[in-house]
């Protein structure tokens, strides 16, 4: 069978598993890198200024 009924079979397996470095469920199995910390893609930890926000809405470093 092909077409629309077959698309339901695609998402049975897990896209992301637990990352060895950061511990979050963000390691892409097929692309071999972590979407959260960048493990597998770079040695440096993936970090952006827009990532973390305090409860009162102010950004923290």
From Swiss-Prot:
<dbReference type="InterPro" id="IPR011332">
    <property type="entry name" value="Ribosomal_zn-bd"/>
</dbReference>
<dbReference type="Pfam" id="PF01907">
    <property type="entry name" value="Ribosomal_L37e"/>
</dbReference>
<feature type="binding site">
    <location>
        <position position="19"/>
    </location>
    <ligand>
        <name>Zn(2+)</name>
    </ligand>
</feature>
<protein>
    <recommendedName>
        <fullName>Large ribosomal subunit protein eL37</fullName>
    </recommendedName>
</protein>
<dbReference type="GO" id="GO:0006412">
    <property type="term" value="P:translation"/>
</dbReference>
<feature type="binding site">
    <location>
        <position position="22"/>
    </location>
    <ligand>
        <name>Zn(2+)</name>
    </ligand>
</feature>
<dbReference type="InterPro" id="IPR018267">
    <property type="entry name" value="Ribosomal_eL37_CS"/>
</dbReference>
<dbReference type="GO" id="GO:1990904">
    <property type="term" value="C:ribonucleoprotein complex"/>
</dbReference>
<keyword id="KW-0699">rRNA-binding</keyword>
<dbReference type="InterPro" id="IPR011331">
    <property type="entry name" value="Ribosomal_eL37/eL43"/>
</dbReference>
<comment type="function">
    <text>Binds to the 23S rRNA.</text>
</comment>
<dbReference type="GO" id="GO:0005840">
    <property type="term" value="C:ribosome"/>
</dbReference>
<keyword id="KW-0689">Ribosomal protein</keyword>
<keyword id="KW-0862">Zinc</keyword>
<feature type="binding site">
    <location>
        <position position="34"/>
    </location>
    <ligand>
        <name>Zn(2+)</name>
    </ligand>
</feature>
<keyword id="KW-0687">Ribonucleoprotein</keyword>
<comment type="similarity">
    <text>Belongs to the eukaryotic ribosomal protein eL37 family.</text>
</comment>
<dbReference type="GO" id="GO:0003735">
    <property type="term" value="F:structural constituent of ribosome"/>
</dbReference>
<keyword id="KW-0479">Metal-binding</keyword>
<keyword id="KW-0863">Zinc-finger</keyword>
<feature type="binding site">
    <location>
        <position position="37"/>
    </location>
    <ligand>
        <name>Zn(2+)</name>
    </ligand>
</feature>
<dbReference type="InterPro" id="IPR001569">
    <property type="entry name" value="Ribosomal_eL37"/>
</dbReference>
<dbReference type="GO" id="GO:0008270">
    <property type="term" value="F:zinc ion binding"/>
</dbReference>
<keyword id="KW-0694">RNA-binding</keyword>
<dbReference type="GO" id="GO:0019843">
    <property type="term" value="F:rRNA binding"/>
</dbReference>
<feature type="zinc finger region" description="C4-type">
    <location>
        <begin position="19"/>
        <end position="37"/>
    </location>
</feature>
């Amino acid at each position: 069978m092909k077409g629309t009924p077959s698309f339901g079979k695609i998402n049975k397996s897990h896209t992301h598993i637990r990352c060895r470095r950061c511990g979050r469920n963000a390691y892409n199995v097929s692309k071999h890198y972590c979407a959260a910390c960048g493990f597998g893609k770079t040695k440096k930890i993936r970090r952006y200024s827009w990532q973390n926000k305090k409860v009162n809405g102010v950004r923290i470093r």
